[in-house]
Swiss-Prot record:
Protein name in UniProt: Large ribosomal subunit protein uL2
Signal peptide boundaries: none
Pfam families linked: Ribosomal_L2, Ribosomal_L2_C
PANTHER family: LARGE RIBOSOMAL SUBUNIT PROTEIN UL2, RIBOSOMAL PROTEIN L2
GO cellular component, one term: postsynapse
Location of this chain's protein in the cell: Cytoplasm
InterPro entries attached to this UniProt entry: NA-bd_OB-fold, Rib_uL2_dom2, Ribosomal_uL2, Ribosomal_uL2_arc_euk, Ribosomal_uL2_C, Ribosomal_uL2_CS, Ribosomal_uL2_dom3, Ribosomal_uL2_RNA-bd_dom
Organism encoding this protein: Homo sapiens (Human)
Effect of H209 to A/G: No incorporation into translating E.coli polysomes; ribosomes assembled normally. Significantly reduced translational activity
PTM annotation ((3S)-3-hydroxyhistidine): residues: H216
Keywords from the UniProt entry: Cytoplasm, Hydroxylation, Isopeptide bond, Ribonucleoprotein, Ribosomal protein, RNA-binding, rRNA-binding, Ubl conjugation
GO molecular function: RNA binding; rRNA binding; structural constituent of ribosome
Single Gene Ontology BP annotation: cytoplasmic translation
Taxonomic lineage: Eukaryota, Metazoa, Chordata, Craniata, Vertebrata
Length: 257
């Protein structure tokens, strides 16, 4: 019998867990309240910080609590173009400016947004990675729904009450710069999680991986595997509908969507 393979050991956690000790906190929008639903609330960008393990910078935005005599600091995903000292307005009656938070139903068609809510009040789930954005396509006032185009290119119909930050997530073009050397990859994944360096299965011994062994590096069996395979065998293309390169032009695929 072979050893417990890497994919099985990952499920147990331990050294494979994400390195969250140095992270700055959850980046999300304000909890929706009366001030945002019926008017707007003003905050100020105090600082723009780096969050280890995240490509996009974060903005520390300070708001006056509308219900208690104190200040609240929120961590927003920074939109490209915002700066320290800038005023940020959140609410239904806020203006359409970079960094402001508005319901998508109040935005004109074609608006570029980021940190978009999937459901009303979930504080931002979509288009959050560096350089990403979603586009408001159309509104349906009767059903109070809005159609948006996501970074993947897929279209999604969401509630018009969902909020979003106006603009593009900062840090765009990050992946255009090549890593070039192993040392940079080492530090990148040291901040994220233990998944580097990744040894190929065909380079292992037969006891360590189903694709290991042989006089030359080859899989030696179909790389597709059924869904209900045991954990030690479930490697490769799991329950693949199709394999191989995608044929056809992108425009045709977009029309199908």
């Amino acid at each position: 019998m072979g050893r417990v393979i890497r994919g099985q050991r990952k499920g147990a956690g331990s050294v494979f867990r994400a390195h969250v000790k140095h992270r700055k906190g959850a980046a999300r929008l304000r909890a929706v309240d009366f001030a945002e639903r019926h008017g707007y609330i003003k905050g100020i960008v105090k600082d723009i910080i780096h969050d280890p393990g995240r490509g996009a910078p974060l903005a520390k935005v300070v708001f006056r609590d509308p219900y208690r005599f104190k200040k609240r600091t929120e961590l927003f995903i920074a939109a490209e173009g915002i700066h320290t000292g800038q005023f940020v307005y959140c609410g239904k009656k806020a203006q359409l400016n970079i960094g402001n938070v508005l319901p998508v139903g109040t935005m004109p068609e074609g608006t570029i947004v980021c940190c978009l809510e999937e459901k009303p009040g979930d504080r931002g789930k979509l288009a959050r990675a560096s350089g990403n954005y979603a586009t408001v396509i159309s509104h349906n006032p009767e059903t109070k729904k809005t159609r948006v185009k996501l970074p993947s290119g897929s279209k999604k119909v969401i509630s018009s009450a969902n909020r979003a930050v106006v603009g593009v997530v900062a840090g765009g073009g990050r992946i255009d710069k090549p890593i070039l050397k192993a040392g940079r990859a080492y530090h990148k994944y040291k901040a994220k999680r233990n998944c580097w360096p990744r040894v190929r299965g065909v380079a292992m011994n037969p006891v360590e991986h189903p694709f290991g062994g042989g006089n030359h590096q080859h899989i030696g069996k179909p790389s597709t595997i059924r869904r209900d395979a045991p954990a030690g065998r479930k490697v490769g293309l799991i329950a693949a509908r199709r394999t191989g390169r995608l044929r056809g032009t992108k425009t045709v695929q977009e029309k199908e969507n």
